[in-house]
Amino acid sequence: MGISDRLLGKKNVNGKPHIEAVVPAAALPGGEVRIIGSGLKPPELRRPRVQFGEVEGAVVIAADDFVIARVPDGAVTGPVVVSTNGSVSNGHEVRVAAPIAENLHPVANPALDAEGNIYVTFSGSRGQKVPVSIYKIDTNYAVKPFLSDMMNATAIAFDRAGQLYVSSRHDGTVYKVAPNGTMSSYAEGMGVATGIAFDREENLYVGDRTGTIFKIGRDRQIYVYATLEPSVSAYHLAFSPAGVLHVTGPTTSSYDVVYSVDSHGTVSVSYRGLGRPQGLAFDVDGNLYVAASLGGKRGIVRITPDGKASLVVSGQNLVGLAFAPGRSAILATQSAIHHLSWGIQGKSLLD
């Protein structure tokens, strides 16, 4: 490529806008993406137009070689194009998460049963009794009340038999919940119980956000497994494909960490540099996905096994995620649930 081509953009020698990439390649409505290319800004200080399918998105920043645009409500997965001076660029696919339920209050990952039904909390503020604690969203995205008698339902997990467990940060208890929505106490006395996760042997791990990870054996014996820096909100737990427990817990720092905890309870820093990291999940290749901020941008951050982090989904107010059938993901914000066709195979939570 010659100097003039580099200045003009190799594929923009005819003066038309050209898109080379969109980063990140997935977003929720309201999330911002960076469109990279050439000829993207018209002359005379006018702004380009950005279309996500049939819906126009707001332009936040525009330059000749990039445009930052906000994904509008109503956008769906499909091509984004940039228009300048009557010329329209090539299309470049952006995957847009589709809203499936709102008026909720999840504070951690949603959970899916073996049939693909989604379970999500309406957690409420500390000590607030709400009419419905957990909602069930079926495969047709019909939302129905599932559990009504729990204060501050926080984290949800299923064991290998399909039994549902829920933590309550109000009373430090983990409850078993039957398919008909009746509940019974499984383990008590765990402080401010937040995140929960099962290991391969079906021991249950519970994060008390004041600084302790508890391990509950299948005989219901409770052990102190590890101690961590306290969190201002909650611990979130997930096991890697190698069977190593990973924990996030937002603090007052803007440079928070992901912890790894080995089988002996020894705590290490797996990654440092996230803002308010919350729910987390692994794919089958060992990449870790965290609802967090990276470099001031909120969304889903992917951390590779060798420690490289990048924002792969843009979206405000994300608190958690769960991989779903069909190489997709369920994304939870502070008030809603979205479905994203992502092309990523999630790790089974009990393998």
Where are these regions (language model features)?
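Residue-level detector of Asp-centered blade-edge/turn motifs that repeat once per structural unit
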Residues: L112-E115, F158-A161, F198-E201, F239-A242, ...
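Beta-rich catalytic cores
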Residues: P106, V130, D149-N152, H170, ...
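Surface loop/turn motifs at the tips and blade-to-blade linkers of beta-strand repeat domains
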Residues: P99-H105, P145-M150, S185-M190, Y225-P230, ...
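Ser/Thr/Pro-rich low-complexity tracts
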Residues: M1-Y119, P131
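Short glycine/acidic-enriched loop and turn motifs that connect beta-strands
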Residues: K41, G124-Q128, D171-G172, G211-T212, ...
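Conserved beta-propeller blade signature
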Residues: N117-T121, Q163-V166, N203-Y205, V244-T248, ...
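Blade-level signature of beta-propeller repeat domains, shared across WD40, Kelch, NHL, RCC1
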Residues: S314-D351
